[in-house]
Amino acid sequence: MTLDLTPDELLSTTRAVRKRLDLDRPVPRRLIEECIDLATQAPTGRNRQRWHFIVVTEPRLRRKVGDIFLRALAAAEGQPLNEHDIRRMNHAPRSTQGVFDGLRHLTDNIHRVPAFVIPAIEGRTDHASAAVQSGTWGSILPATWSFMLAARARGLGTTWTTAQGPLERELAATLGVPYDEVMLAAFIPLAYTIGTDFKPAPRIPRDQVLHWERW
């Protein structure tokens, strides 16, 4: 069963869900597979389809992966933000605080999340040119966002994290992923949501981000 959402409603209400995850309700395998089927309809560079999705639901493995998530977050904590991030944070301090509050709730309950989805792509971008990086990331990010949209349509919540970054090699080894050949693109907690009444989020006004013809 899917929610009765128009395309515009789906696009404007697929939120990063950290607090409103139903941690006691398992996610059926068939629903995850439906979302993956839709994800792989996304565009991919030269139709090479180098994407992969690792889904973790087994309790002991989830605990191991959750531990890596927490240690990776701790490793990233305290790293300096660039000036662009700082400027945007100052633009909406209340929203930023909400993100931190949600992240705290997620980390406190990470071992209770019923499923993790780790999108991956064949080929690494370490020390690659901007053009190579653009082509590689452009072949996994659209599919991952399509997965998240499909999940929302089925009453599931997701949040995009890159917590795997500092400990990507360890996470890859834990999941049997050949690190030298495959890059882990994100770390996505997945669960049913508590309620489905998500709303569009406050955003920077269009006239501050839209540029016609030139910057």
What positions do the PLM features span?
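Glycine/small-residue-rich phosphate/adenosyl-binding loop
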Residues: 55-138
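C-terminal helix-cap and adjacent tail motif
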Residues: 2-3, 13-19, 183-215
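Glycine-rich, charged/polar anion/phosphate-binding loops
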Residues: 37-41, 100-104, 171-174, 195-197
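N-terminal accessory segments that position/regulate proteins before the catalytic core
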Residues: 1-34, 57, 64-67, 75
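Small-aliphatic-rich amphipathic alpha-helix that forms the alpha element of a beta-alpha
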Residues: 39, 115-174
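Short, surface-exposed beta-edge/turn micro-motifs
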Residues: 50-51, 113-116, 184-185
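Glycine-rich phosphate/pyrophosphate-binding beta-alpha loops
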Residues: 42-47
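A glycine-rich helix N-cap at a beta->alpha junction
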Residues: 74-86, 175-200
